[in-house]
């Protein structure tokens, strides 16, 4: 996690959790002079509705205006993680053992950067993924992006 993402998480996690939601994670993407800050919230019992996103957005916006951690123009987006939820922390991988996942690494590992397989588990700081009957131990710090892949049966 970059220093900027850590700073944003430290500011926003208490706001989201103070409103009674789970802070799932954040993404910050810079696009030239304009950026996008995505805040993912969850509620395992009740799910997330548009009203929940609006409520969190208002609070986050107010805190961001006061703290001012982003010096450029940006758009704030608050949403549920959805069915293809991104994974940000090792605990989230543990919670989705047996689920299909798409992982993109920062650098190639064993000749590839993209892995599509099943989460087998977490061993220390490694995510164990099975791809075509081959088991990979992917260092968590090397993962650039990971999303659950919904399976419709």
Curated annotation (Swiss-Prot):
The keyword Cytoplasm applies. GO terms for biological process: ribosomal small subunit assembly; translation. Its main location: cytoplasm. It comes from the Bacteria. The keyword Ribosomal protein does not apply. NCBIfam families: PRK00092.1-1 (NF000927). This is Ribosome maturation factor RimP. The gene is rimP.
